[in-house]
Swiss-Prot record:
Protein name according to UniProt: Translation initiation factor IF-1
Function: One of the essential components for the initiation of protein synthesis. Stabilizes the binding of IF-2 and IF-3 on the 30S subunit to which N-formylmethionyl-tRNA(fMet) subsequently binds. Helps modulate mRNA selection, yielding the 30S pre-initiation complex (PIC). Upon addition of the 50S ribosomal subunit IF-1, IF-2 and IF-3 are released leaving the mature 70S translation initiation complex.
Origin species: Herminiimonas arsenicoxydans
Keywords per UniProt: Cytoplasm, Initiation factor, Protein biosynthesis, RNA-binding, rRNA-binding
Cited SMART domains: S1
Sequence ranges assigned to domain S1-like in this UniProt record: 1-72
Gene (UniProt): infA
Length: 72
């Protein structure tokens, strides 16, 4: 699967949801559902409400995102 068509954006975690999903507010004001990427899951990266994150959106479904990086 090609990763050339993903859209990377910055966001902030609003709340935790079940099954390692989160409600993320993007920098443009939209609120999306985000799930943790596999590498973050393998390395036990903890994400809490208020954390700044980098998410990847696919152009096919702009209401869901993959959380790929947590900034300090």
């Amino acid at each position: 699967m090609a990763k050339d068509d993903v859209i990377q954006m910055q966001g902030e975690i609003l709340e935790n949801l079940p099954n390692a999903t989160f409600r993320v507010k993007l920098e443009n004001g939209h609120v999306v559902l985000g799930h943790i990427s596999g590498k973050m899951r393998m390395n036990y990266i903890r994400i809490l409400p208020g954390d700044k994150v980098t998410v990847e959106l696919t152009p096919y479904d702009l209401s869901r995102a993959r959380i790929v990086f947590r900034t300090k």
